[in-house]
Structures are given as C-alpha cells and as structure tokens.
Amino acid sequence: MESNLKINKVELRNLRMEDYDQLAGSFKRIYADHDVFWTHAQIKKLITIFPEGQVVIVVDDKIVGCALSIIVDYNMVKGDHTYAKVTGNETFNTHNPNGNILYGIEVFIHPDYRGLRLGRRMYEYRKELCEKLNLKAIMFGGRIPNYHKYADTMRPKEYIEKVRSREIYDPVLTFQLSNDFHVRRVIRNYLPNDEESKHCATLLQWDNIYYQPQTDSYVAVSYTHLTL
C-alpha cells in the first residue's frame, strides 16, 4: 500500500446492482489468473435473497472492496464441507433465512487499497449484522495461501500453530486471527483448485456472545437495514 495515496472519503454501504460494472473490474484485477468471476445474475440473486449480507467499500466514489455472505444452518457447516456444497454450486439455493450462521462466501480489497484497514471495516459490519439478526456465529472456509511453501516439512496443524504464534505470516489466516476468528478445524478439498493452500482450508468462526437460541415463542428478526 502506497503511503502517499490521497483519500478524501470512505463509505461502507450495501451493494447495489448498478455497482456491478465497477465490481466486475475489481474482480478481474484480483482474480486475473482465473477465467470465472461473479456473474451479473449471481450478484442480483444475492442482493435479492439477502441484501444486508452484501456490502462494498467505496473510496472516493470507487468500489475497492466487497464482502458477500449468506445464512445457513450450523449443522450444514460444522463438519467437513466444500465451497461448492455450501453455496449450492454458487446458485445460493442453500441460503436459509431461518438458519443461525452468517457464512462468508467472498471478501476482497483491491490491491491498490490494501493496508488501510478497509477489510476490518467489512468484518466489523458482519459482526454487527450477526448480532442484529441474532445469529449464532460467523463462519467461512479460509485459504492458507502460504502453506505450499512449508507443506513438505509440516502438516497443516503445525503450520496453523506457527501462524497463530506469529512465527509464520500468512496473508489470509494472519488477518482472520487478528479479527478475533478462531480455527475450528482443517477441511480438505474446500477449493479443489487451490494449489497454494495444498487443497486445505481453515474453518474459521467468530462467536456471537449475545446470541439467544430460538424458542417456540421466538419472533424472527427481520432484515432491517443497518445504519452504515
């Protein structure tokens, strides 16, 4: 991140369909080595089924970050699962408004704007949303992209411990741990083409300490837009 980058305004807000062209441009910059990006139809569906779960960071009228999520039931994701399974092969038919887990399916910051704690802002929003909707936790599968450098000499468990103790830096896991997430387990083949992570991912979780289990008399919290 260039220290002399001049920024006048930073805004966190819900994603809108008119943002798609800018969003697609950022996707192509970040995932330049991949041929597949989020389609217009996929973004439209996410906004339709769960608008509060989709947010962007806007810096001086430019979209530089995005976080996408759905709601699922804990029983679906507490054990081994894949990204394809939890997203319904990216159809998001797995979204369950009556579930109890806020599940992260995407987060990114444009390379030119990293190091400004913008990602942390989106995670704080997710935590606020989790509490607002009375969900049990935030969960997601996290890559460990530096693991391939150590895979010949250590198992994933040892690698994770060394990242936790700050003996090793991992750009994804180090960030997640610094945001109060903990590793529940290692899941294999979460993203089958993730060679950098050696086909491993960490199942990460942040617990909502204010969560109140639903009872028969529980009235579901409506998707009220948060003030951003």
PLM regions: where:
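Conserved acetyl-CoA-binding loop-helix of GNAT-fold acetyltransferases
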Residues: G115-C130
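Conserved acyl-donor/pantetheine-binding loop and adjacent beta-alpha core of acyl/acetyltransferases
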Residues: A67-E106, E124, R143-P171, H182, ...
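A short beta-loop-alpha structural element at the N-terminal edge
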Residues: K9-L23
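Active-site acidic-Proline motif in GNAT/NAT acetyltransferases
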Residues: H110-D112
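Helix-loop element at the rim of GNAT/NAT acetyltransferase active sites that forms part
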Residues: N14, G25-W38
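Active-site rim helix/loop that mediates acceptor-substrate recognition in acyltransferases
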Residues: D33-V59, I63-M76, H81-N93
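C-terminal "cap" of GNAT-fold acetyltransferases
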Residues: E167-H182, N189-S222
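Conserved small/polar residues in nucleotide/adenosyl-binding loops
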Residues: T224-L228
